[in-house]
A protein has these predicted regions:
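Helix-loop-helix hairpin linking two adjacent transmembrane segments in secondary transporters
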Residues: 141-184
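Residue-level signature of mid-helix packing/kink "hotspots" within the transmembrane helices
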Residues: 28, 56-64, 149-150
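Helix-to-loop junctions at the C-terminal end of transmembrane segments
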Residues: 62-74
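Primarily marks hydrophobic transmembrane alpha-helices of the MFS/SLC 12-helix fold
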Residues: 76-79
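Paired small-residue
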Residues: 89, 100-108
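C-terminal ends and interior cores of transmembrane alpha-helices
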Residues: 84-97
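Helix-breaking motifs and short loop linkers at transmembrane-helix boundaries and internal kinks
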Residues: 42, 74, 95-97, 130
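Intracellular juxtamembrane helix-capping segments at the cytosolic ends
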Residues: 37, 115-129
Length: 184
């Protein structure tokens, strides 16, 4: 039983690390799309800034909702729903032709970020790891989120430079598919 508990804890930590690494990295890459999207939809930076602000508001609104889903059903269900919203919002962002779709994509994307963000992931890790290793495991998972910003933001910049901004978002969608596996 102890071995199973240890293996389960390790899987939850690895899954949490991957989820936060990818979701934080992609979420914090959003600013790199300011110029390409603003030029594409022929607006100033204020529309894009407003959409990103809405994204962060949706993270704040969605976090307690996904926390309640995690409490009532499981962290896996909440994480999977979050990843689905995350992918839909990210994909819609690649289809943006005007400010309305940009804002809608960020509403959905932000809601998804809440589901595969710290509230759900750290709750799952905190339940899976007990005792003296709990704070260490929570720190490792949060460090993975920071590592995601360190790795994925430059990767996104490279993808934008090597292809167009819409294709780079589709590449990020493809990378994000790994989150489905680790949300289970």
């Amino acid at each position: 039983m102890q071995l199973f508990r240890h293996s389960y804890s390790t899987l939850v930590i690895i899954g949490g690390c991957i989820l936060l690494l990818v979701s934080f990295g992609i979420r914090h890459s959003s600013g790199l799309y300011l110029i390409p999207i603003s030029e594409h939809i022929q607006t100033g930076r204020e529309v894009f800034g407003f959409a990103i602000a809405i994204q962060f508001l949706m993270i704040g609104i969605g976090s307690p909702i996904f926390g309640a889903i995690a409490d009532k059903y499981s962290s896996s269900v909440a994480g999977l729903l979050g990843v689905i919203f995350f992918l839909i919002g990210l994909y819609l962002m690649s289809l943006v032709e005007g400010s309305f779709l940009l804002i809608i994509s960020q509403v959905i994307f932000g809601f998804g970020c809440a589901g595969c963000g710290t509230a759900v992931i750290l709750g799952a890790v905190g339940k899976a790891v007990t005792g003296k290793y709990q704070t260490l495991s929570l720190g490792v998972v949060m460090a993975a989120g920071s590592l995601g910003q360190f790795l994925i933001v430059p990767l996104t910049g490279f993808l934008i430079e090597m292809s167009d901004w819409q294709r780079s978002i589709l590449y990020l969608c493809f990378i994000s598919l790994i989150m489905i596996l680790f949300s289970l």
